[in-house]
């Protein structure tokens, strides 16, 4: 069973920010600009510029490139209206540079958390996501899933397996 740290991925994964088979970004800045706009458009953040700055600030603290075609950029700021996770699967990978580390990225999980949120909420979401990413079944799911509903069902199945 995946350790959830009090966070259920099914509760924080955002349907409107599950974007499958998008054309690759040219760079991380284009990704951050795009995702900040999507988070604002869908009512997750009140100010896309503030959220983009929060993403960039977090990048200055350490890498969000995880290897294996995965990046987990995240931002904490008061402009986050509701905590959530967006998932983007690209058609092809692009070069993602992050705090001195770089590599190809095709799967992106973007976290938005209010800076005044619950005790270490962002760390608990990250820890839960890391638990999923260690599961071969979850990796297969993120590679092959065709819809948010399919991704959600797979997450719920994995969460209840012993």
What do these predicted ranges mean?
Residues 1-162:
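Cytosolic covalent-transfer regions centered on His/Cys nucleophiles
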């Amino acid at each position: 069973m995946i350790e959830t740290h009090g966070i259920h991925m099914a509760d924080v994964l955002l349907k409107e920010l599950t974007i499958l088979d998008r054309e690759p970004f040219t760079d991380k800045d284009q990704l951050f600009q795009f995702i900040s706009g999507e988070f604002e458009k869908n009512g997750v953040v009140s100010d896309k510029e503030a959220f983009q700055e929060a993403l960039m600030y977090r990048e200055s603290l350490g890498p969000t490139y995880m290897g294996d075609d995965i990046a987990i950029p995240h931002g904490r700021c008061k402009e986050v209206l509701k905590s959530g996770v967006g998932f983007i699967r690209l058609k092809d990978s692009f070069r993602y540079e992050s705090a001195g580390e770089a590599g190809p990225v095709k799967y992106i999980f973007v976290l938005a958390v209010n800076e005044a949120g619950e005790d270490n909420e962002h760390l608990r979401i990250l820890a839960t996501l890391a638990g999923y990413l260690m599961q071969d079944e979850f990796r297969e799911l993120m590679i092959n899933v065709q819809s948010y509903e399919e991704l959600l069902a797979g997450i719920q199945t994995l969460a209840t397996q012993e």
